[in-house]
Regions:
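Bacterial N-terminal signal peptides
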Residues: 1-9
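N-terminal targeting leaders of membrane proteins
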Residues: 14-113, 206-257
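Mid-length scaffold segments of soluble, non-membrane domains
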Residues: 96-183
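Contiguous hydrophobic segments
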Residues: 127-144, 197-203, 238-257
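Cyclophilin-type peptidyl-prolyl cis-trans isomerase
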Residues: 170, 181-226
């Protein structure tokens, strides 16, 4: 199960067109990443404390400690060395390529959630970036973002779609390598996995893991100077609770968009 989910890591986070959900990137999960997201920018309607059942606390806490240690001991040093070695522009090209590749996830979930303007915009951006951005390496729409952004934010994955359909989180979960999730979001990972073109690449299991790991190291390297995960956890009395509550609030915001 873990190996299967590892192959789908960060699909929903990157699908949003952001660099990644900061927590998911930090613990090799979305993001949701990279896009890069700001937990402090929630609308007033989300200021009220959001909660979710956490009956698997000891399982979750164990894997949270594991993921956090792995981040600080391995993934952050790797991303730091990679950022020192490779200039920012090529790393941005790599990020653009993977974001562009996840077009099917965004398009399908925009259609499923009735965001037809966002679906149309995703098609337009995909064609433009693929045709004129060297297969997605360049983001030719970035210079005029107001011309390419739909009225409502684009859907980021099947977890958001399930939430809009009325499915609650279920219980809170933390997966090794993937980071924070829930029953609903874990089911969403499966949908994202099967809509991700990379899933169907002619690669061995180890090659697939290597490609996805590289994708996440690259995304993390672009977040090092403004790392929301570290900002969130460094001053927290209870790092586990801080990450859990921020994640639930973030997903509630995405579902309401």
């Amino acid at each position: 199960m873990t190996a299967f989910l590892l192959l789908g890591t960060a699909a929903s986070a990157l699908a949003a067109g952001e660099l990644s959900d900061p927590i998911e990137v930090a613990q090799f999960s979305s993001g949701q990443i990279g896009e890069e997201s700001d937990f402090d920018s929630f609308d007033d309607e989300y200021d009220e404390y959001q909660t979710v059942a956490d009956p698997l606390y000891y399982w979750n806490k164990t894997w949270f400690v594991f993921n956090d240690g792995l981040y600080h001991a391995l993934f952050k040093p790797l991303a730091t060395g990679y950022a020192w070695l490779i200039p920012e522009r090529p790393r941005t090209w790599v990020s653009n390529f993977f974001i562009n590749m996840l077009f099917p996830v965004r398009f399908i979930n925009n259609v499923l959630t009735g965001k037809f303007d966002a679906a149309y915009m995703e098609v337009s951006k995909f064609i433009a970036n693929t045709a004129f951005g060297l297969g997605g390496l360049g983001d030719v729409t970035a210079d005029r973002p107001h011309n390419w952004e739909p009225e409502r934010p684009t859907a980021d994955g099947f977890g958001q779609t399930l939430g809009k359909a009325g499915f609650g989180h279920g219980v809170y979960l933390v997966w090794p390598f993937l980071g924070p999730s829930s029953i609903r979001e874990s089911v969403g990972f499966v949908g994202d996995y099967f809509c991700d073109p990379l899933t169907y690449a002619d690669l061995t299991f180890l090659e697939m893991v290597a490609v996805r790991a590289y994708k996440n190291v690259n995304a993390l390297s672009l977040e090092l100077e403004d790392n929301n995960y570290e900002t969130l956890t460094e001053g927290a009395v209870d790092k586990y609770a801080a990450v859990r509550d921020a994640y639930i609030r973030y997903r509630a915001k995405k579902v309401a968009e």
